[in-house]
Amino acid sequence: MHSLLFQAATLCLPEEENKSIEIDFHFLAPREMAQMNMQYVGHEGITDVICFNYPEAMAIPGEEETSHIEIFICPEAALKASEKPGRTYESEIVLYAVHGLLHAAGENDLSAGEKKKMRKKEKSVTGKLRRRYNFEDIFKKETRNI
């Protein structure tokens, strides 16, 4: 899983010289995700992914700049979405990770045009990842009980 997430970050985030990035992925239960969604986004109910990007949040004078990204994913949302034809739990989890990384890269999906652009990028990145990884082998069925 680490390799897939590293590759996803490489595909989604711009490369910046002399800057490192720390990325934390958190998997939350629906209740916790709903609380975060209300507190930080102002929306009621659960959501699939929330991203926080703290550019230069960990800057230490004289040392390499470090950005910190936190991505919160709700596996229960992925499980529910996987009930739709052509979708799997594993591909939804990867999609949510990619979606969060694209937000961290500055992409938005608030307007119809932005949403279309973001969906195109999501499809491109997940397609590249799928050619390299078998999502079902990475996210074993046991992770559904998070």
Model-derived regions: residue spans:
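An acidic/histidine-cluster motif and surrounding catalytic segment
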Residues: M1-V94, L102-I146
